[in-house]
A protein has these predicted regions:
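Peripheral, non-transmembrane regulatory/ligand-interaction domains of membrane transport proteins
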Residues: 1-150
Length: 153
């Protein structure tokens, strides 16, 4: 799923990409990946790195592109292992912000709703990256409290 998000009073979805907007891609199809490479020249190596479920958090530069990989929490339906982490990549240059996650998570939709509720004005890519890191930490703590509640006494 591909979303074009523009920050007004929080992030709102638009029908097409606008300069300084955020392209969020969740569970990308081959067409989504090709779109990112063709339309925005996103490095293919970045997209394949994010696809690796064992990818570790890091930053990497390639030309004028910056790749930031985070590990974000994911709730599983498997009762033996109720929680896991998956990589999300935030790919930026001077004109675009792209996030790619190969898994459906609660983090990004919740983050978008939060920016709308608080009418946040996120001014640049660095602020967005830091706010996504913070949101990830909030979800880790939320899931940690669920683990604590469900522990047998």
């Amino acid at each position: 799923m591909r979303q074009f998000l523009y920050c007004e009073a929080g992030y709102v979805e638009k029908n097409q990409w606008l300069p300084n907007s955020w392209v969020n891609v969740e569970c990308p199809t081959p067409e989504d990946l090709q779109f990112l490479m063709d339309r925005f020249n996103v490095p293919e190596s970045f997209l394949s790195d994010i696809a690796d479920t064992d990818e570790r958090p890091r930053i990497e530069y390639e030309g004028n592109w910056l790749l930031t990989i985070l590990r974000i929490p994911l709730q599983n339906q498997d009762h033996d292992i109720p929680f896991n982490t998956v990589p999300i990549g935030i790919i930026t240059n001077n004109e675009i912000i792209v996030s790619v996650c190969y898994h459906k998570t609660d983090l990004i939709p919740d983050f978008i709703r939060y920016t709308q509720r608080k009418e946040l004005q996120i001014k640049n890519k660095y602020e967005l990256i830091l706010r996504l890191i913070h949101s990830s930490a909030v979800w880790f703590l939320k899931y940690l409290s669920l683990i604590h509640i469900s522990e047998p006494t």
